[in-house]
């Protein structure tokens, strides 16, 4: 009986194969994996924000990216961005219902510490982006942004339970109709757990703390936000996967505003949905 149980347990464990960790945390928090040398993929990656202090607010940004892994230590992505807006009755924002091509983004990821001798793996990600419309309001602007991330993870239970954490620095500069360049920056840190509940399906939770500043060098603090929510990853086939997250601002504050939460620099809720198609 004991040998039968041990054999059954071994079969169960064998069903849980090794996973690439890049997208298992829902993609707000990103894992360290860079894929297999020579891999190519197409990735529609949508980020959406919902809810301001009052009125109706929804805005999304979809990056249509080509991903290529020239070596096991380096990965590149690039492609156009499409944005959509549905804004009505939000103080400080003009009403808008529209969709438009909104720029171009690229990303370079490089492994700093490979998993092996070290229990942790760490990857550096740099993502420059150009936008022709403001990501919050949709008005025409000239915007340049650089998202810099340290992406780290470790395996707590082999092939089953994973811990990920990110550090974020995101400076940007924007020129609107007045012709004046305005600088701002967002910094943050995250922690995420992901559990492979059945083979190729991972559920988890993601926690982010974000701070916003006027000026690129932490000039004037304007507000902060804590986001928390569930994540889902599904390896649909050997060539296709899905990664999703939905997070709510559970704490935060805006400088000079009494109500809780920062709903000027951040949204009440945010979501992310990515599909990957290898070829």
What are these regions (language model features)?
Residues 10-279:
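Transmembrane beta-barrel domains of Gram-negative outer membranes and organellar outer membranes
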Residues 3-7:
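N-terminal signal peptide c-region/cleavage motif recognized by signal peptidases
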């Amino acid at each position: 009986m004991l040998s039968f149980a041990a054999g059954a347990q071994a079969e169960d464990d064998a069903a849980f194969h090794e996973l690439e960790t890049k997208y298992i945390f829902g993609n707000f928090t990103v894992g360290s994996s860079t894929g297999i040398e020579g891999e190519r993929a197409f990735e529609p990656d949508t980020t959406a924000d919902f809810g301001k202090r009052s009125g109706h607010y929804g805005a999304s940004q979809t990056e249509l990216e080509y991903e290529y892994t020239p070596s096991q230590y380096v990965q590149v992505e690039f492609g156009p961005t499409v944005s959509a807006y549905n804004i009505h009755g939000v103080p400080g924002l003009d009403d808008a219902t529209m969709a438009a091509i909104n720029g171009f983004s690229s990303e370079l990821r490089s492994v700093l510490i490979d998993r092996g001798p070290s229990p942790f793996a760490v990857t550096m990600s740099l993502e420059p982006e150009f936008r022709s419309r403001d990501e919050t309001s949709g008005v025409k602007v000239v915007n340049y942004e650089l998202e810099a991330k340290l992406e780290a993870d470790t395996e707590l239970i082999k092939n089953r339970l994973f811990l990920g954490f990110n550090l974020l620095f995101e400076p940007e500069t924007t020129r609107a109709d007045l012709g004046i360049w305005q600088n701002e920056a967002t910094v943050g840190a995250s922690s995420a757990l992901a559990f492979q509940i059945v083979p190729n399906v991972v559920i988890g939770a993601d926690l982010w703390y974000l701070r916003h500043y006027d000026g690129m060098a932490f000039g004037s603090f304007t507000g902060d936000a804590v986001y928390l929510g569930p994540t889902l990853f599904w390896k649909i086939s050997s060539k296709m996967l899905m990664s999703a997250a939905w997070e709510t601002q559970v704490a935060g504050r805006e400088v000079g505003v009494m109500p809780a939460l920062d709903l000027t620099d951040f949204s009440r809720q945010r979501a992310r949905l990515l599909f990957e198609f290898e070829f």
